[in-house]
């Protein structure tokens, strides 16, 4: 008789170890008096961090902290129910109106988590017998939403509009949905949103964009990738749904989806991850209202971030020439330094950690085989000196790291 399948788990974990693919958590905390997004305590040690998604340095902003405290005083710390029962607080309702106005789309729906947003809205839009077209490098939440939908999934080559057009043309499905990251989370490049919409117009498809890494950073006043493409306000398309998270540049937590009143109403009626989950606490909505106001008002944060991006990319040029590592094209806060092998990426990460810098290595299956990398995340909180410290440490560590295979 064979043993329990539970007996296989230790061997499977050992396989992850052997392939340098086992994931480990680190306990982090903010450093008192230090800027959020750039400095943190990692396993009890102070670190200069290049891994936070706090792109504008707002997570510890005193205005947000005060707003959250005021929200807790007014509403308590929990919502007490799902949105369609008793959890849709006046704070959450006000945030939805503010978000819709900010991204210049008719209506917004506020969710408690980004992953649950995409995993829920995709199955609400398409199902069995429908066709779904997904970029090869989409985030896991879009991929899982596609799987849950039971629609026929067509995976097109990354950012390849020609491949997408051919697959759309070949489809006989009446209902079609194209899903894409707006800013790709592991590469940092921005999708051709106008090109995607043109194809959706041509083939009568809906377009769902995940702007987790563009909201607050790109576009006029940080209104996001869709606004940067000039496709909001009077130019908004009724076939576009715009999703963005609120735990990255906004510095808090949650997510929202915005679009036409009709599409958002449909999502409210049919998205299981919205209907059957406890609503986000009102205190977070209070903090987010303050965050969106700061995002809109403070262009200097985006300007500082743009300066750090330019400094990093220019400073890495000698390292790339010497090591053969690759810095992927990106004008966003996500800067992917592709090293290749898992072992080398881990060695570089460890060397940086020993020097007081925290830049975790990203390995398969999060990224394709052979493209293990440092995902360098920049923040407006980083200084020119911070970037120079990273460049110096990378130069030192790269000379000690195992050679490329």
Swiss-Prot record:
Named cofactor requirement(s): pyridoxal 5'-phosphate
PTM N6-(pyridoxal phosphate)lysine: list the residues.
Answer: 248
Q: What class of enzyme is it?
A: transferase
* Matching Pfam families: Aminotran_1_2
Q: Name one GO molecular function term.
A: pyridoxal phosphate binding
What biological-process terms (Gene Ontology) are attached? biotin biosynthetic process
EC assignment: the record states: 2.3.1.47
| Matches recorded under InterPro entries | Aminotransferase_I/II_large, AON_synthase_class-II, AONS_Archaea/Proteobacteria, AONS_Proteobacteria, PyrdxlP-dep_Trfase, PyrdxlP-dep_Trfase_major, PyrdxlP-dep_Trfase_small
**Keywords for this protein:** Biotin biosynthesis, Pyridoxal phosphate, Transferase
Q: Which reaction does it catalyse?
A: 6-carboxyhexanoyl-[ACP] + L-alanine + H(+) = (8S)-8-amino-7-oxononanoate + holo-[ACP] + CO2
What SUPFAM superfamilies does the entry give? Answer: PLP-dependent transferases
Its family remark reads: Belongs to the class-II pyridoxal-phosphate-dependent aminotransferase family. BioF subfamily.
- Spell out the protein name for this chain: 8-amino-7-oxononanoate synthase
Species, as recorded: Delftia acidovorans (strain DSM 14801 / SPH-1)
């Amino acid at each position: 008789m064979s043993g329990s399948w539970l007996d296989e788990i230790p061997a499977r974990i050992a396989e992850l170890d052997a392939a340098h693919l086992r994931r480990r958590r680190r306990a982090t905390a903010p450093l008192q008096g230090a800027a959020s997004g750039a400095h943190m305590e990692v396993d009890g040690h102070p670190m200069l961090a290049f891994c936070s998604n706090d792109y504008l340095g707002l997570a510890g902003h005193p205005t947000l902290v005060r707003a959250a405290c005021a929200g807790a005083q007014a509403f308590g710390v929990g919502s007490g129910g799902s949105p369609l029962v008793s959890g849709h607080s006046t704070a959450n309702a006000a945030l939805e109106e503010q978000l819709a106005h900010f991204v210049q789309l008719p209506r917004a729906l506020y969710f408690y988590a980004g992953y649950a947003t995409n995993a829920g809205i995709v199955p609400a839009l398409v199902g069995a017998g429908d066709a779904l077209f997904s970029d090869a490098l989409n985030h896991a939440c879009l991929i899982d939403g596609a799987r849950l939908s039971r629609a026929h999934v067509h995976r097109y080559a990354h950012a390849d509009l020609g491949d997408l057009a051919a697959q759309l043309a070949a489809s006989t499905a009446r209902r079609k949905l194209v899903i894409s990251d707006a800013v790709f989370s592991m590469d940092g490049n921005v999708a051709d949103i106008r090109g995607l919409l043109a194809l959706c117009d041509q083939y009568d498809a809906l377009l769902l964009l995940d702007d987790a890494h563009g909201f607050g950073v790109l576009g006029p006043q940080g209104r996001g990738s869709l606004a940067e493409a000039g496709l909001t306000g009077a130019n908004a398309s009724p076939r576009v749904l715009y999703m963005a998270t609120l735990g990255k540049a906004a510095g808090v937590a949650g997510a929202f989806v915005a679009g036409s009143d009709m599409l958002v109403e449909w999502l409210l009626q049919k998205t299981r991850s919205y209907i059957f989950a406890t609503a986000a606490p009102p205190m977070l909505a209070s903090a987010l209202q303050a965050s969106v106001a700061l995002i809109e008002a403070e262009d200097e944060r985006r300007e500082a971030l743009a300066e750090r991006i330019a400094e990093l990319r220019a400073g890495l040029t000698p390292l790339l020439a010497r090591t053969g590592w690759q810095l992927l094209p990106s004008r966003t806060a996500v800067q992917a330094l592709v090293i290749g092998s898992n072992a080398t990426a881990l060695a570089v990460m460890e060397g940086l950690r020993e020097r007081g810098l925290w830049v975790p290595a990203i390995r398969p299956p999060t990224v394709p085989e052979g493209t293990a990398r440092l995902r360098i995340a920049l923040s407006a909180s980083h200084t020119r000196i911070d970037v120079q410290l990273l460049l110096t440490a990378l130069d030192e560590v790269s000379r000690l790291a195992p050679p490329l295979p």
